[in-house]
């Protein structure tokens, strides 16, 4: 069993983009930024508990941080993980919270 404290640290934020909006409309899929060390099972449990929805599947990927220049110096942005969470038919997550 995964601790409740860990579940709260797994999901960092919803990832809003043109592609994620199309996925949400057509495939009932929501996209989240998650902790880099989070597993699919942890993501599934966290979404189910926090948003009280049934999760069908979870797909994850790691985006590698880009190398950026600041004048003569080079730096690197952090790697981050993204999770595509497919919800069960009829389930919905409302991020705006409008009533």
Curated annotation (Swiss-Prot):
PROSITE patterns assigned to the protein according to its UniProt record, in alphabetical order: RIBOSOMAL_L23 (PS00050)
Subunit and interaction comment: Part of the 50S ribosomal subunit. Contacts protein L29, and trigger factor when it is bound to the ribosome.
Name of protein: Large ribosomal subunit protein uL23
NCBIfam families xrefs: PRK05738.1-1, PRK05738.1-3, PRK05738.2-4
A GO molecular function held by the record: structural constituent of ribosome
One of the record's GO cellular component terms: ribonucleoprotein complex
Keyword Ribosomal protein tagged: yes
Family: Belongs to the universal ribosomal protein uL23 family.
GO BP terms in the entry: translation
Function: One of the early assembly proteins it binds 23S rRNA. One of the proteins that surrounds the polypeptide exit tunnel on the outside of the ribosome. Forms the main docking site for trigger factor binding to the ribosome.
InterPro entries linked: Nucleotide-bd_a/b_plait_sf, Ribosomal_uL23-like, Ribosomal_uL23/eL15/eS24_sf, Ribosomal_uL23_CS
Record bears the keyword Hydrolase: no
SUPFAM superfamilies xref list: Ribosomal proteins S24e, L23 and L15e (SSF54189)
Domain of life: Bacteria
């Amino acid at each position: 069993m995964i601790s409740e404290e860990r579940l709260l640290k797994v999901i960092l934020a919803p990832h809003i983009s043109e592609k994620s909006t199309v996925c949400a409309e057509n495939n009932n899929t929501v996209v989240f930024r998650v902790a880099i060390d989070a597993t699919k099972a942890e993501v599934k449990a966290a979404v189910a508990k926090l948003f009280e929805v049934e999760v069908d599947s979870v797909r994850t990927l790691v985006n590698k941080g880009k190398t950026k220049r600041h004048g003569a110096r080079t730096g690197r942005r952090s790697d981050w993980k993204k999770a595509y969470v497919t919800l069960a038919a009829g389930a919905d997550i409302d991020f705006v919270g409008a009533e």
